[in-house]
From Swiss-Prot:
Gene: ybeY
Cofactor(s) essential for the protein: Zn(2+)
Protein name per Swiss-Prot or TrEMBL: Endoribonuclease YbeY
Major subcellular site: cytoplasm
Gene3D superfamilies the UniProt entry points to: Metalloproteases ('zincins'), catalytic domain
Source organism (scientific name): Rhodopseudomonas palustris (strain ATCC BAA-98 / CGA009)
Amino acid sequence: MSQPRPGHRPDCNGADPDSNFASMTHSARPFTEVVIEADCWQAEASAEATVLRAIETAADAVDADTGGAELAVMLTDDDHIRQLNASFRGKDKPTNVLSFPAAQPEVQPDGAPRMLGDIAIAYQTVRREADDEGKPFDHHLSHLAVHGFLHLVGYDHETEEEAEEMEDAERAILARLGIPDPYAGQDRVS
């Protein structure tokens, strides 16, 4: 991750096993490291592969220079994401996904990788939302990974126009993954 990594988090039930790390092979896409920080994610054996596939597909779909760049995705729990949400957004509650775009130096040192930033995704919130919305867990996880990635490459949803552009990009990327429109039947949110 672009900032110092926080200490290992226990699993979602308070145990403290070792973290698991995985990464995608280097190519024209960004190098993506997935850090499974909370063991509750072990219930979803394909979570890592799902996130990597979503990021690869998003990188292929958007007009952004991501080749050779690096990003990290932290699969965490509601408690940790609540702390991050409180610290960085002033909202003392869990959320499904947070993105932290990296500040880009004016001059990149030779040979230094360009950092896109970090994404954090909370298991319990993702599980609850998927269940409440009747969506497969991997579809919702893919959507949130894509959403987080789009924030790292400059998309936002602060205005109605931005939200429409971002949601259209999400729909197109998810369609490439064979995932139905996550906004079908919903009012637009900004």
